[in-house]
């Protein structure tokens, strides 16, 4: 809904051409197919990673640009339903604090932008992966399929199909939500009734 609202405002303000808006709408309509691709091809990899990481005491999630809110969402879901200490950070802040938390075997999840387009962002995220890998971190990446740099430095990769950068969060959150669900189930927690959470606030 937010995407459609944004396109509507862009049309009213003349910020985008009509064909650009239509192209974006067509891409948006294609997102369910791409999400289904992730469900069909990545579910086992996600479950296997959760089984391997089920005893981990903490996780770091890192992302740049549109990957930052994905990192925050991934960290939040793991915290909410698997009761695992997690923190989400902007990947650009890695050297200003988060890297101090990286110990041998620490799981660090990176949301990797595609190499095409703004490939400077891709290069910076790969550089961050190299840095924490050198300090013994266990790297889990969410990345566009067939990215050789990600394969080279990551221990586990949850692949996504190619999609427009601004819509990639719709796809990237899926394996992270599955990962949190699998972690919770492996710990015998009820994912439908997280403890102590209030989904509404009453002001007295």
What are the residue ranges of the model-derived segments?
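A SIS-like phosphosugar-recognition module
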Residues: 1-204
